[in-house]
From Swiss-Prot:
It comes from Klebsiella oxytoca. One of its GO terms (molecular function) is L-malate dehydrogenase (NAD+) activity. NAD(+) binds at residues 59, 82-84, 192. Its EC number is 1.1.1.37. One of its GO terms (biological process) is tricarboxylic acid cycle. It holds the Pfam family Ldh_1_N. Transmembrane segments: none annotated. It comes from the Bacteria. This is Malate dehydrogenase. The active site is at residue 142. Belongs to the LDH/MDH superfamily. MDH type 1 family. The keyword 4Fe-4S does not apply.
Length: 223
């Protein structure tokens, strides 16, 4: 598997205004110093026959360790959790930040953007539209049946009851579709990378003062 510094060198050859640095090792402090946004995608991937909850025992410890380092090094950063099972790893991150006395519910996000881009793709395919013209809000986090696409909220598009049932099931099971298609070779990586980039860039645009930037995410409510 490619190591992080090698991936960083590869990325650094792409002509953008972003400066790329790569870090590796157990101590994430050098990578976290001065960070305004941290996205955590570290963890083991699903294999056929597993669901996201099967990853908990390993991934919970990984997230806990990284968030403890965030609490020490960049406690004011906005933190996006991509590591599955998102609904649980976000809760772990929240407890670690609370214990450190630096928790801000407005700065901790479960990144569920992958469900949104999948929904946009599947709806566009079904209705013969361009995916760039479709935006499906998805709520409930990123754990199987909790994934709830709000299909009734898409302007100018209507669905039969059967279409709603079929689409919802496909969106909820899209991750399994990829895992099975890869036949033991991992889970969704390319589409997840696109989703993570979209969420991260939206966060940065909003932090820079751009108005009207909206993304769905798994967050603590006001209740």
């Amino acid at each position: 598997a490619p190591v992080t510094p090698g991936v960083a060198v590869d990325l650094s050859h792409i002509p953008t205004d972003v400066k790329i640095k790569g870090f590796s090792g157990e101590d994430a402090t050098p990578a976290l110093e001065g960070a305004d946004v941290v996205l955590i995608s570290a963890g083991v991937a699903r294999k056929p026959g597993m669901d996201r909850s099967d990853l908990f025992n390993v991934n919970a410890g990984i997230v806990k360790n990284l968030v403890q380092q965030i609490a020490k090094t960049c406690p004011q950063a906005c933190v996006g959790i991509i590591t599955n099972p998102v609904n649980t790893t976000v809760a772990i991150a929240a407890e670690v930040l609370k214990k450190a006395g630096v928790y801000d519910k407005n700065k901790l996000f479960g990144v569920t953007t992958l469900d949104i881009i999948r929904s946009n793709t599947f709806v566009a395919e079904l209705k013969g539209k361009s995916s760039s013209d479709v935006e499906v809000p998805v709520i409930g986090g990123h754990s199987g049946v909790t994934i709830l696409p709000l299909l009734s909220q898409i302007p100018g598009v209507s669905f039969s009851e059967q279409e709603v049932a079929d689409l919802t099931k496909r969106i909820q099971n899209a991750g399994t579709e990829v895992v099975e298609a890869k036949a033991g070779g991992g889970s969704a990586t390319l589409s997840m990378g696109q989703a993570a980039a979209r969420f991260g860039l939206s966060l940065v645009r909003a932090m820079q003062g751009e108005k009207g930037v909206v993304e769905c995410a798994y967050v603590e409510g006001d209740g």
